[in-house]
Structure formats: C-alpha cells, structure tokens
Amino acid sequence: MKRVTGVFLTLLRFSQFASSVLVMSLLAYAIHAYGNRGNKKTNFTLATGVISVFYLIALGILCLALPTLIYIGMYFCAELIVCMLWLAAFVVLAKAQGERSCSNTNADGLYYNPYSGQYTADSHRRACNSSQAAIAFSGLCFVLFLISVILLGINVLTPIRKRYQTQGMWRSGASMGTKLHRWSGLALSEPFEETAAYDNTNVRTGDVEAGAGDNAAYTSEPNGDARYATNDPNGQYHTTTTNTRYTTTTADPKTRYTTNDRNPGSANVANSAVDQHAYSTDESGDRSYQEKVTEGAHSGAMSGSTAEPNRNVNQMP
C-alpha cells in the first residue's frame, strides 16, 4: 500500500512538471508565431510556468539530497503560493485568449490578433490553437497543485502539528526524527510512531494511609490479591497496615507493644524480653509513661523515643 502511494505521489509531481512545461512551450510558440512579444496577461502566465518548473526542480533536488530538511511551515507556504499563481494565471489567460474563437472573423473577414489587439488577414490558426491549449493546461496545473497542497497538509503538516504543535512548523526533519518522501516530498517516509493512550480503567486505587484501604494491588504486583506484609526470615514479627495504626507483636508472648502512632516522627524500639512498658494518653491530651522492671534495672536493654518533649515520666516501684 505504501509503495502504491509513493508511485501515485511521484506521478503527481511528474504531471505537474509536464503540465507546466507544456504551458510555457505553447505560449512561447504562440507569441513567436504571432510575431509579437506578448502582452502582460500572457507574460504573467508564462512567468508562472517558469516559476513552477524552477520550484519543482529545486524541490526534487532537495528531496533527493536533503530529505530531512523539511521546515513544513515554509514548504507549505511555497506550495500554496504556486497553487494560487496557477489559479490567477488560468483566469487571466482565459480572459485574454479565450474570449474569441480561432475561426471567428469580423465583417471584413479579418481575424483577431489577441496579442496586438488588432484584426489581420492572417488567421494564425496553429498559434491560436496553441494559446487555447495553454488555457486548458494552466487549469490542469491549478488542479494538480491544489491536490498536492491537500496531500501535503494531510500527510506532512497534520502529523507534525499533532506531535510538535506550532513549534514543529519551523523545525527540520532531523530534529524530529523523520524525513520526506524522496521522489515527491508529499509524505513522510518515516512516519511518527503512534503512542497508545494510557488506559487506567482496570486499575483500582485506594488510599491506605487515609483509611480507605482495600485489597486492590498495584498493576506491578505479581499477585493481584495479596496484601503487603513484612517478610521476616526469623518469624519474629508480622506487620499489618490499617488506617495508619501499626500493631507489632513479637514472638515472645511476655513482651507486647501496642503503639497508636499519632505523630509520624515518633518511634519506639525495645530489645528486652523481660521489660514491660506501657504508654497511655489521658483524655486531656497529656501523656504518661510508666516503666516496670521485673528483674532489676540492669536485666534488659530498653530504648525509647517519643515526639512529646514535655511528657511526665513516673517510675513504678
């Protein structure tokens, strides 16, 4: 399919070039046959043909030698200008050469010379027919360039604008990682890769820290039904997270700690299996600390920290 598209675009450019050359050739022959230098209207069409041929030759060289030199903003404007020139040339030439038929004569049997604006005895039949044919080919040039403008907008301008917005209008193909079709310049030979939109419809979310925890796991979790738990190789503790409250139970049933973590900056660490510690908070908000040592002051190691700097410490006998 891409090969068929490339052949079609190449044939389109070749048709534009051939039609432009035909318009120039037909008008040049007509002007020479009439023995005149032409008029402003005819010369305008002739100049349009010259501009078109030069543009197509320059474009072909650039597409072959520098296909990454895109600058779609300038390229699209140039293509559109040539198209509008052919529209104006078609209208002007049809007005100058198409008002009268080549076989029409006046009352004296004289033929009208469109270049001099006078009636002569010479019909200049072949020159007149060449001028009429130039009108048809100038209209064909306009249609062909109109098609190329549309294709350029669809195949090149639109993808670049979708990916790079307005900044892509004035960027080279090398900076965007693409290049033009070598034989036509009407498509990207290396189109941009389409990026699939992110779909999170099957992802369940839950704010565990805010108390809205559920069994849903993130997509990267191998087991979607598993809750997160701490894996302790010695089997000494198991941690469960529920509504920002943390309960830790050691393997020794004699030592248990329960911490209501109201301040994330606090931490409590205990390493003695014989010390018993209790933390409590009364309704007024003041904290009290009680410590009971069952086997002497030096029977175990204990370290604790709290975020309350003004706590009351009472040691039980």
From Swiss-Prot:
Source organism superkingdom: Eukaryota
Transmembrane stretches, start-end: 14-34, 50-70, 72-92, 134-154
Membrane-side (Cytoplasmic) residue stretches: 1-13, 71, 155-317
Biased composition (Basic and acidic residues): 284-295
GO cellular component: cytoplasm; membrane
Residue ranges annotated as Extracellular topological domain: 35-49, 93-133
Glycosylation sites: N43, N129
Alphabetized UniProt keyword annotations: Glycoprotein, Membrane, Transmembrane, Transmembrane helix
Pfam families in UniProt: MARVEL
Chain residue ranges for the region called Disordered: 204-317
Location in the cell: Membrane
Bias (Polar residues): 256-282, 302-317
Low complexity bias: start-end ranges: 239-250
Induction note: Induced under aerobic conditions.
InterPro entries: Marvel
Membrane topology: Multi-pass membrane protein
Protein's UniProt name: Uncharacterized membrane protein YDL218W
Protein species of origin: Saccharomyces cerevisiae (strain ATCC 204508 / S288c) (Baker's yeast)
